[in-house]
Amino acid sequence: MFVSVQASQVSVACFVALLLVAAASDVVSYRIPNAVVLAILLLYPVYVVVTPADVDWPWALAVFAAAIVIGMGLSAAGIFGAGDAKLLAAVLLWAGPELAPLTLIICLIIGGVISAIMMTRVRFVLAGAFSSLGSQTLSNALLAKNMPYGVAITAGGFFVAWALMTSV
């Protein structure tokens, strides 16, 4: 078995890069590509194999399974997007049982902040500012009715990545 702090950190950095792609896609098109979520899922076993940290992967799989079942239920009820549910489950796989509760709290707080912005006049001010800076994509995202919750999930994923990087 190949164990390396550097390889572990590279796998976590790839996780972060994939989260950024998911968030950007969610902001631009309100879609999180299945290929990105699949890449995040397939990268996890690589991390488990190369990290010198002790990973409780069976319980991480249990957290993932619970998250995907609950998330798909919420998606079927029209409460949560399917892409968001899949991305959250993938992030919680990486989080495992130890980091999952705090990761969910971070996602909820950031999601709440985004919701507050989307429900107030602040979004129009921010949209105008982004438009004047030449970022029409961000401006349009702020003026849309949908909320890119993948951004909040990505913030939770950043916490997971930070925790994993600092634990080895």
List each language-model region with its residue ranges:
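A membrane-topology feature that recognizes alpha-helical transmembrane segments
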Residues: M1-V168
